[in-house]
Amino acid sequence: MDLIPNLAVETWLLLAVSLVLLYLYGTRTHGLFKRLGIPGPTPLPLLGNVLSYRQGLWKFDTECYKKYGKMWGTYEGQLPVLAITDPDVIRTVLVKECYSVFTNRRSLGPVGFMKSAISLAEDEEWKRIRSLLSPTFTSGKLKEMFPIIAQYGDVLVRNLRREAEKGKPVTLKDIFGAYSMDVITGTSFGVNIDSLNNPQDPFVESTKKFLKFGFLDPLFLSIILFPFLTPVFEALNVSLFPKDTINFLSKSVNRMKKSRLNDKQKHRLDFLQLMIDSQNSKETESHKALSDLELAAQSIIFIFAGYETTSSVLSFTLYELATHPDVQQKLQKEIDAVLPNKAPPTYDAVVQMEYLDMVVNETLRLFPVAIRLERTCKKDVEINGVFIPKGSMVVIPTYALHHDPKYWTEPEEFRPERFSKKKDSIDPYIYTPFGTGPRNCIGMRFALMNMKLALIRVLQNFSFKPCKETQIPLKLDTQGLLQPEKPIVLKVDSRDGTLSGE
């Protein structure tokens, strides 16, 4: 039996021509960085360097940084990706040339009406939405919203107490994932869910389904390899985000909005209410107000941006506190001094806790959940003698910079004192857990407040210790956002017999 099919000469010729054309298409941009004298790993035809992401984006960036120095070039399919680590160049990209050249983040491909979400919106559309949402995230508004977040802190303590009383080690992701879910659905959708005890709630199920997204998702990969397919997918109504989930969440926002507009009572001040108010505000006359679909897109993107990140950072923080009991005790001492006898936290009390701020900042240095910052180059530009072509993507490898011994002594060590106000100031273009410049994370203040409140509440009531199930040293996962390879498990001891917040 012949192993080679007996095909006509014309068929073989057509096949050969097709393969040559595919090769030419798959390598057409791959000589760019070599011509510019920028080092980097050799790309594969069609794929570029995306297969290297399987080892973990954080690991890939760190290895490239060590091997190639302060700048290197890679390819995602045909897309040239330039990594920069020089603080002056980073400042130019994120701040000085943000509005003119580096306004937009990565294009995800077909996302339907979610393209108006603040994280995905582009150019003038992004500017408009950012200016409409910015008043929602001021410290004054967060202070007004604080009691809402605080009530979920009470639920967090109750749930952790219940788990700890079983006498078994506690999986932190379960507890903090529920807290994060409760806060985000409560503030963005106006619904109260004790998600740990109501896992079948449609909100919980929809949100978790929405979050199952990775860099190696087949649809996402096909868009990286063949970006010209994006308009085809859009015409076919194909979206990266699960359609049934998006529809459910969008309808939920509209239903809650109608309910609040029909009910003339004063409603609690959460993100949803602030966005509804902005639709009717005279202050928005300089910008077109948010449409109902745009409002829904913002509520939905808050889940995507906040759920996994908040629960992961809280888990990482308590892992570090459990493995550094001296730091844990010092932090508990500060909390007890500012809030004696387990007094309920206030906005002002949280803001004044310096050591808590240092602990959270150091955790975000070691574990920046967004491994990279990404900006698309809108036009040919030269920065510090480096030519960056239109259409390429510039990345700032946050994880690699946060672990660079040039900037951090013994970078793998957990040392909150690095962020002491008595020390030299930290370079804002090297330490970027929330990005920096006009397109930084709009929810930064909210995220920090949310995490700090959770830490205060649990540390008022409990102490955390490693147990035999705790993975030491901690290993990081290789997929998607920065998270542990295995869920973090710790022993939880009650600090006394009384339950705070009850």
Curated annotation (Swiss-Prot):
Its main location: endoplasmic reticulum. This is Cytochrome P450 3A5. Changing A337T: In allele CYP3A5*9. It is a peripheral membrane protein. Heme binds at C441. One of its GO terms (molecular function) is monooxygenase activity. It catalyses: an organic molecule + reduced [NADPH--hemoprotein reductase] + O2 = an alcohol + oxidized [NADPH--hemoprotein reductase] + H2O + H(+); 17beta-estradiol + reduced [NADPH--hemoprotein reductase] + O2 = 2-hydroxy-17beta-estradiol + oxidized [NADPH--hemoprotein reductase] + H2O + H(+); 17beta-estradiol + reduced [NADPH--hemoprotein reductase] + O2 = 4-hydroxy-17beta-estradiol + oxidized [NADPH--hemoprotein reductase] + H2O + H(+); estrone + reduced [NADPH--hemoprotein reductase] + O2 = 2-hydroxyestrone + oxidized [NADPH--hemoprotein reductase] + H2O + H(+). Its EC number is 1.14.14.1. GO terms for cellular component: endoplasmic reticulum membrane; intracellular membrane-bounded organelle. It is an enzyme of class 1 (oxidoreductase). It is found in: Endoplasmic reticulum membrane; Microsome membrane. Pathway: Steroid hormone biosynthesis; Cofactor metabolism; retinol metabolism. It holds the Pfam family p450. SUPFAM superfamilies: Cytochrome P450. Keywords: Endoplasmic reticulum, Heme, Iron, Lipid metabolism, Membrane, Metal-binding, Microsome, Monooxygenase, Oxidoreductase, Steroid metabolism. A cytochrome P450 monooxygenase involved in the metabolism of steroid hormones and vitamins. Mechanistically, uses molecular oxygen inserting one oxygen atom into a substrate, and reducing the second into a water molecule, with two electrons provided by NADPH via cytochrome P450 reductase (NADPH--hemoprotein reductase). Catalyzes the hydroxylation of carbon-hydrogen bonds. Exhibits high catalytic activity for the formation of catechol estrogens from 17beta-estradiol (E2) and estrone (E1), namely 2-hydroxy E1 and E2. Its cofactor is heme. Signal peptide: none annotated. Induction: By glucocorticoids, such as dexamethesone. One of its GO terms (biological process) is retinol metabolic process. It comes from the Eukaryota. It comes from Homo sapiens (Human).
